[in-house]
Amino acid sequence: MRKQEVRTGREAGQGHGTGSPAEQVKALMDLLAGKGSQGSQAPQALDRTPDAPLGPCSNDSRIQRHRKALLSKVGGGPELGGPWHRLASLLLVEGLTDLQLREHDFTQVEATRGGGHPARTVALDRLFLPLSRVSVPPRVSITIGVAGMGKTTLVRHFVRLWAHGQVGKDFSLVLPLTFRDLNTHEKLCADRLICSVFPHVGEPSLAVAVPARALLILDGLDECRTPLDFSNTVACTDPKKEIPVDHLITNIIRGNLFPEVSIWITSRPSASGQIPGGLVDRMTEIRGFNEEEIKVCLEQMFPEDQALLGWMLSQVQADRALYLMCTVPAFCRLTGMALGHLWRSRTGPQDAELWPPRTLCELYSWYFRMALSGEGQEKGKASPRIEQVAHGGRKMVGTLGRLAFHGLLKKKYVFYEQDMKAFGVDLALLQGAPCSCFLQREETLASSVAYCFTHLSLQEFVAAAYYYGASRRAIFDLFTESGVSWPRLGFLTHFRSAAQRAMQAEDGRLDVFLRFLSGLLSPRVNALLAGSLLAQGEHQAYRTQVAELLQGCLRPDAAVCARAINVLHCLHELQHTELARSVEEAMESGALARLTGPAHRAALAYLLQVSDACAQEANLSLSLSQGVLQSLLPQLLYCRKLRLDTNQFQDPVMELLGSVLSGKDCRIQKISLAENQISNKGAKALARSLLVNRSLTSLDLRGNSIGPQGAKALADALKINRTLTSLSLQGNTVRDDGARSMAEALASNRTLSMLHLQKNSIGPMGAQRMADALKQNRSLKELMFSSNSIGDGGAKALAEALKVNQGLESLDLQSNSISDAGVAALMGALCTNQTLLSLSLRENSISPEGAQAIAHALCANSTLKNLDLTANLLHDQGARAIAVAVRENRTLTSLHLQWNFIQAGAAQALGQALQLNRSLTSLDLQENAIGDDGACAVARALKVNTALTALYLQVASIGASGAQVLGEALAVNRTLEILDLRGNAIGVAGAKALANALKVNSSLRRLNLQENSLGMDGAICIATALSGNHRLQHINLQGNHIGDSGARMISEAIKTNAPTCTVEM
């Protein structure tokens, strides 16, 4: 692609000399064209000494003069600090998504929630360098960003840094050019293109330095007057031949002209799709503001008014739609100006129309009011009078509105003097407020003037305001520039025409225009703009009919498209929110399944975009049919977390979801499909999507029927997939064959960290395969293997794996028919394993003999924190052995001994251990008949123990005397937070003892006294005691023979005495 950069001395010398300007330009063009010395017929014109150095010549006086010229052109600008630090690096992207190619910028920001895929970044100073040792520098680079993201700011910043020698040091020549400049020419040759950037190149005293490598910057492709057509453009290699500007640019990008020059193009995403992907070597994207950068941006706008800043930040954070749009820097500044004017306009809460904006149109109405008030004009100018404000608003809309409107229709965003004259714009009005707040003026290199709206959305707002006013008196179709059409009378007729045009525009270019047009009919906007732009109360005649018209646009199509969702945005702007609210209430109540009409589907898709709850997790469980899901597919792409449990989905639905997960636009990170009817065919469809998906990190398929074949398909995908970190196949009957397939995947996969294989009929052979994989795998952190049948053989195999595995942190072997032999093997491994933190052996067949092995391991192991031995056969002998280990162990924090036939003797041993142990924070002894003696032993420990925070003594045969000593312990204990005494028999006496403790205890947060025969008297004691305890957060007094009336009285008393405490009666 690229020729040698080191040329001969004669060739390298072609950048110096004192030849004529024409000869200098010719030499420069030859070098840019890659012809070297042979391409120039007048080398003597740029001759230099043979021993002159090669390379960029950054210290050459002529280069310095060029850098100075660039600095005068780009001027000052933001330094890389505060919110502008984001320009120090760009996101590397792999081509454009369908959303970027087809939808409006606002839709892109809303759908992606202000952020794209997690992507690699490239530093600005490495933007044009190879990404690896084996790659080459990119010739054609494109940087994309929605309108107002800072593309031109980035270019100017890069040019400024290059002129100071801080970036692009291997470029001897940087030629920045904007499409606004190019639009002033009908035809150009390559020679004239360069001269337009370098007017000083023709001066006899200045020659061009050696272009060891040159960079041509083309800023703002979306502003190009004529779309680029790479299919029908004739190739041109003659730099002197004048051709249409779009043909010239096309040939430069193709490499027919300037093949040795690096090309950097900036563009909005949709416009960049004109360039074939095969011609683009590198694509980057400017990221938007994050929350901190939004704050810094607003701080820089209002550095001296902290009250205003605090209020403004609270408004932005409270409105999700406003926050998302503020990730776009230009919109963030516009929002700051509008909210700042609102703040300064408020005189008190009686100003109903001065409350913060709830819609886009309200926000822009405040900006419009700011412009009319003269707040945005230069200091020193007098503010306009009230009558001037009203006249100025209508005159500005009349002056610029038609231009803005027809510019939208033609996708024209830059205007020149001839455009202004064609639409009757008085140029004299553009210099002051309010036009200066909407339109910016820029001189081009061709000595002409270009105008553009300060942000695309302002053009759309002014266009909507123009259309709103014109449609009230127009008799022909306003969308026809010539004005010749079938008669159209009445505002509603013209609104219907606008809605139809917007629905038919596949690229969404009229979406925001229609939102603004709808918003101008809302009561709040009418109150804001009455007198200056709108007539007081005129919206009332049309608002209801417009709402019906918009809802009529929601047809029962196969899929809910972006246009349909925009209708819901329009209804929101109109402040007609009944449809969206009904669907939101149905989602919250679980009644979504009965709302299946096209309007409800569109509203659901809209909520998936804008709802705060859906932003956290879109819960569509128990609510969707295949048809409804199919219609929502385009919108599900952008849900971060998606729950589709218990929807009776079968394999065909998985084909649909697979297509979503395979999409380049897919943003889904977590998806749950639990308790559906998915078989191996559906699992295979999902597996195919995992081969290409790069966003999904968690997949939950529990409670389906994928079987061994489905597990194999998913396992094969895991050998390639590098993003999935959590996979649940619980209850899928994958058996040993499925476990073997998963084990094979784990041998090579290095990203999966959680694998759930509970209830899958896996036996010893499957466990052996998984153990073999664990000997090699270092990434898996959690393995859930409960409710299988691995037996002692499987346990021994896993034990061998634990001796060498240094990654697994949690292992669940509940209900696996493991006896003492298997436990002994596992405990032998624990003596040396240094990574396992949690082990569950509940519901197995561990006897006192196995408990001895456990005790030995606890004495040797220094990493295990959680051990669950619930529902085994430890008895007192086994519990005593473990108690001895607890005395010595310094790392175990949670110990579950529920339902192990433990009695008072073992409880006494555990109590003695707790007096010495300083690490155990949770002890579960429920459903063990430890009685009052056991409770006394535990109570003695609580008086001195400072580590235990949770104690579970449900159904432990504890009576009043046991409660008495526990109460005495609670009176002095300062660490216990949870005490569960459910299902005992402490009675009124026990309640009184605990009540006395509650009066002085300051640590307990949850107390469960359910089913303890407290009676009314005992409950009253507890309720009364809480008047002095304001730290208890939850108490359960159910099942204590209090009666309904007593329960209400006790509940009210507790709420009175402890308002923050939740009561269960």
UniProtKB/Swiss-Prot annotation:
Q: Which GO terms describe its cellular component?
A: centriolar satellite; cytoplasm; cytosol; intracellular membrane-bounded organelle; perinuclear region of cytoplasm
Keyword presence, Nucleotide-binding: yes
User: Main localization of the protein?
Assistant: cytoplasm
Residues annotated for ATP binding in this entry? G145, V146, A147, G148, M149, G150, K151, T152
Q: Where is the composition biased (Basic and acidic residues)?
A: 1-10
Q: Name one GO biological process term.
A: negative regulation of fibroblast proliferation
Inducing or repressing factors: In primary T-cells, down-regulated upon T-cell receptor activation. Down-regulated in peritoneal macrophages soon after the beginning of LPS stimulation. Levels start increasing again after 3 days of LPS treatment.
Self-association and partners: Directly interacts (via CARD) with TMEM173/STING; this interaction reduces TMEM173 trafficking to the perinuclear region in response to interferon stimulatory DNA. Also interacts, but to a lesser extent, with TBK1. Interacts with TRAF6; this interaction results in decreased TRAF6 'Lys-63'-linked polyubiquitination, but leaves 'Lys-48'-linked chains unchanged, promoting TRAF6 protein degradation. Interacts with PIK3R1/PIK3R2; this interaction disrupts the association between PIK3R1/PIK3R2 and the p110 catalytic subunit PIK3CA/PIK3CB/PIK3CD and reduces PIK3R1/PIK3R2 activation.
Report the function annotation for this chain: Negative regulator of the innate immune response. Attenuates signaling pathways activated by Toll-like receptors (TLRs) and the DNA sensor STING/TMEM173 in response to pathogen-associated molecular patterns, such as intracellular poly(dA:dT), but not poly(I:C), or in response to DNA virus infection, including that of Herpes simplex virus 1 (HSV1). May affect TLR4 signaling by acting at the level of TRAF6 ubiquitination, decreasing the activating 'Lys-63'-linked ubiquitination and leaving unchanged the degradative 'Lys-48'-linked ubiquitination.
Q: What is known of its domains?
A: The leucine-rich repeat domain may reduce the interaction with TMEM173/STING.
Q: What is this protein called?
A: NLR family CARD domain-containing protein 3
The gene for this chain is NLRC3
